[in-house]
């Protein structure tokens, strides 16, 4: 199963639609998405199952059962996927497209783009090609755990003021 997660506060129509177009071409693949609030006119996928929100326990179960994660560039989702050693495909929200108030997600993907197991899609077309790649390849991920002291964790501690 492929798990799509866009966070709970904002919908992410560009990513939801890109995954939906990919699913239309790959009906044999099981995909489940957590898409945020779509009741205000947001994109509603027709080719995969989805919900607006999940409890933490439901999120964890879906993440655990997934082959890989397709997500916005939210730091919580990235770290959770890496902790579970799941490859993650990130598409950053962009302020110029009114997807967020600023471009911090672009900075996030720049920081993680060289991390083993992290893939970046800057356009909807990239989402499809990266999903094709992830479905056809065994991908190694960065080994990260809650006790890690590697460069990534040290960097995050520095940024968060904990190191």
Locate the predicted segments by residue:
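Nucleotide-activated sugar donor-binding and catalytic core shared by glycosyltransferases
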Residues: 1-163
């Amino acid at each position: 199963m492929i798990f799509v997660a866009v966070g709970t506060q904002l919908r992410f129509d560009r990513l939801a639609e890109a995954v939906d177009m990919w699913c239309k071409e790959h009906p044999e693949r099981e995909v489940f998405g957590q898409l945020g609030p779509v009741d205000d006119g947001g994109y509603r996928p027709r080719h995969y199952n989805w919900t607006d929100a999940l409890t933490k326990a439901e999120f964890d179960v879906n993440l655990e059962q997934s082959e890989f994660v397709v997500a916005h560039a939210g730091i919580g989702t990235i770290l959770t996927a890496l902790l579970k050693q799941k490859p993650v495909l990130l598409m950053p929200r962009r302020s110029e497209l009114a997807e967020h108030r600023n471009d911090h997600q672009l900075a996030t993907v720049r920081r993680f783009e060289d991390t083993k197991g992290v893939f970046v899609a800057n356009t909807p077309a990239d989402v499809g090609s990266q999903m094709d790649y992830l479905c056809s390849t065994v991908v190694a991920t960065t080994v990260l755990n809650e006790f890690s002291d590697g460069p990534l964790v040290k960097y995050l501690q520095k940024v968060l003021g904990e190191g």
